[in-house]
A protein has these predicted regions:
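Catalytic domains of cell-wall/extracellular-matrix polysaccharide-remodeling enzymes
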Residues: 113-194
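Substrate-binding cleft of extracellular glycoside hydrolase catalytic domains
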Residues: 19-150
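Cleavable N-terminal signal peptides of Sec/SRP-targeted secreted and luminal proteins
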Residues: 2-18
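Conserved beta-strand termini and adjacent loop/short-helix elements that scaffold enzyme active sites
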Residues: 83-85, 154-156, 214
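Functionally critical loop-and-helix segments that line ligand-binding/catalytic clefts
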Residues: 19-28, 170-233
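Short, structurally constrained coil/turn elements
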Residues: 12, 76, 111, 147, ...
Length: 233
């Protein structure tokens, strides 16, 4: 029986790796050698945080900026995307926070066509009023559209329901979804590394999905990261 389980697990892994590429998302400083380590470990992409809450207006996360620039300036053979974790209880609007992201990227010579917006309840206090949260997100989405930046949303079905109540949001029609499905932290809490468990919610359907986080809080190349999969082009 144990051998059969091992065979099935191995077969599923082979299927997953045939259709998907692996990535990590992180919110910690990285070095040149650690980025090389990710690439050597067959990770095809990094998702780096470029904005984080600070209890006031939110602030640019320079760790993510530096990681992106290290990859870009050294022509390292690994992809990189950016995400922002908005300060949902800050004094400024979603639009103003997106402006801070855009200005930081532009100032540092980063031409990111898409910014993923983290809409999760983990370590992020949202308003109890769904309408306030929707207004914040709509402000951010509209500003991105004005600046010509595509939007991705990082969330889950339960978080989206908790934060927006599945109310009408101005999620752009060309927005893509990065969803997470993890049982608990660490290797034993991983879900299947594929999109097979996705169920449509809110404005998102199967066609929206481009990335899935299937593992949370693991150590890779000496860093605390989350692990993801995305479809091969």
């Amino acid at each position: 029986m144990a051998l059969m389980k091992l065979f099935i697990a191995s077969a599923l892994f082979s299927i997953a790796t045939a259709q998907y590429l692996y990535a990590v998302d992180l919110a910690v400083p990285t070095t040149y050698s650690q980025i090389q380590c990710f690439q050597q470990a067959k990770y095809a992409n990094l998702f780096v945080r470029v904005f984080k809450p600070d209890g006031s207006t939110g602030q640019v996360d320079m760790d993510g900026i530096y990681t992106y620039k290290t990859i870009q300036n050294n022509n390292l053979p690994i992809g990189v995307d950016v995400y922002m974790k908005p300060d949902t209880l800050a004094k400024n609007t979603g639009a103003q926070q997106f402006d801070m992201v855009y200005q930081a990227l532009t100032k540092n010579g980063i031409n990111a066509r898409r910014v993923f917006v983290q809409v999760t309840i983990e370590d992020t206090p949202w308003n109890f009023d769904h309408n306030v949260n929707i207004q914040f997100l709509n402000s951010l989405f509209l500003r991105a559209k004005q600046l010509g930046i595509l939007i991705g949303v990082y969330t889950s079905a339960s978080d989206w329901q908790t934060i927006t109540g599945n109310g009408a949001t101005l999620v752009p029609s060309d927005a893509v979804l990065w969803y997470y499905s993890v049982y608990w932290d660490g290797v034993t809490g991983e879900s299947v590394p594929s999109f097979d468990d996705f169920v449509a919610f809110g404005p998102f359907n199967k066609k929206s999905v481009v990335v899935k986080q299937f593992a949370h809080a693991e150590t890779v190349c000496g860093l605390n990261v989350n692990r993801d999969v995305f479809m091969k082009a």
